[in-house]
């Protein structure tokens, strides 16, 4: 019993120190969505400030601002983790989507329209394999008949 008393005396200051140091730790109870939604706009504001350095006509070229976008993504991840939320989550994704709408609404993916090649190219591409298949089949049949006659 006497050995446990000194341990208990040291335990209380350690617990108090832990509580003091862990004042900014994420809550154990889970995600604090209100705090997350209050903190994420800082990331958006910082990203908007960085995007001002890029000319507007270059906003659709990811290579022009990839460093800024990476910083924005890291910021949203850190802010959601600080408040005890996982990342990505639906609220963070909707915030990120809003930032995308604000900055990249004029960027559309140009879908390439595929067309068949001209008939001069298409017909040989179809006919040659068919003729080769028929020729090889005929050759195999002819050789097998010839081999049967030799025996």
Curated annotation (Swiss-Prot):
The UniProt record lists the keyword Cytoplasm: no
Subcellular localization: Cell membrane; Membrane
Chain ranges on the Extracellular side, renumbered to this chain: 31-116
Annotated positions for site Required for CALCRL interaction: 116, 144
Membrane topology: Single-pass type I membrane protein
Broad class of where this protein is predominantly found: membrane
Gene Ontology terms: biological process: adenylate cyclase-activating G protein-coupled receptor signaling pathway; adrenomedullin receptor signaling pathway; calcium ion transport; cellular response to estradiol stimulus; cellular response to hormone stimulus; G protein-coupled receptor signaling pathway; G protein-coupled receptor signaling pathway involved in heart process; intracellular protein transport
Assembly behavior: Heterodimer of CALCRL and RAMP3; interaction induces allosteric modulation of CALCRL function and ligand specificity for adrenomedullin/ADM and intermedin/ADM2. Heterodimer of CALCR and RAMP3; interaction form the receptor complex AMYR3 for amylin/IAPP. Interacts with GPER1.
Record's protein name: Receptor activity-modifying protein 3
Organism field: Sus scrofa (Pig)
Gene responsible for this protein: RAMP3
